[in-house]
Amino acid sequence: MKKYLLTMLALFSVAAVANDDFKASVTAAYGTRTSIYKGREEYGIPIFPSFSYQNLYLKGSEIGFKFFDYDRFNSSIYVDLLDGYSIKGSRMDTGYKSINRRRYQQAVGLQANFKLNEISENLTLTPSFSIGNRGSKTGLGLSYLYMLQENIIISPSVNVKYLSNKYTDYYFGVDRDELGGSIRNEYNPDGTFEFGAGLYGEYYFTRNISALAYVNMKQYSSEVTKSPITEDRIITNVGAGLKYTF
């Protein structure tokens, strides 16, 4: 995967020299996130590359292609290289370390953005669907872009996703060979819902340099929260960072 991403970066670099349609930014952020699993909180210093060349784009772990792009509507097909969750038994709390490792999946998806100009030109409705070898997700999001000042933007959002039976069972179910310690029963959940809300803000120091901050929260329905290996709580993801736009 690392070699593949480096290849993509090299291709985009060549494109940047050859064509003015190339756009790029790099974000370095520090964030903290509570885990859905019964384990330690996860900390990280992620680097988010963002590149676009005509209709082709790379955004974090997502590589996509826009095949419709109009003023009020655009759609894209994409591949997410890091969809899902990744957890090892060694990261779990005492009594729950017998679980097998859960791994990210590579998912292919479709996404569309509809500007709801009848309500506000800054309001966007986003339906999506993605599927990988470990299951599928269907989502619907609503976001609003508000320019507080010329150099300050704020964007609140809400979304709901349905995670398929296969997806939910792989990441949150419990098989017989995982029993041990505090895990005493198998668990085979049906599909579940994920409800989310977020707030993103960005302050531009210059045309190229900006600071950003974000907070995201999500809650799962009972199919996930009743799992022996998960926590019944609101999952939060809070962070801040700097972005450089080329």
Task: List the predicted regions and their residue ranges.
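Short glycine/proline- and aromatic-enriched beta-strand/turn motifs that initiate or cap beta-hairpins
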Residues: 19-66, 166
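Transmembrane beta-barrel strands of outer-membrane/channel proteins
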Residues: 24-32, 51, 62, 77-83, ...
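Membrane-embedded beta-strand positions in outer-membrane beta-barrel channels/transporters
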Residues: 25, 46-48, 74, 107-109, ...
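Outer-membrane beta-barrel proteins
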Residues: 35-39, 58-60, 84-90, 121, ...
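Outer-membrane beta-barrel "beta-signal"
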Residues: 46-50, 203, 233-246
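Repeated loop/turn-to-beta-strand initiation elements of outer-membrane beta-barrel proteins
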Residues: 55-58, 73, 118-123, 151-154, ...
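Outer-membrane beta-barrel transmembrane domain signature
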Residues: 129-131, 135-139, 143-212, 217-224, ...
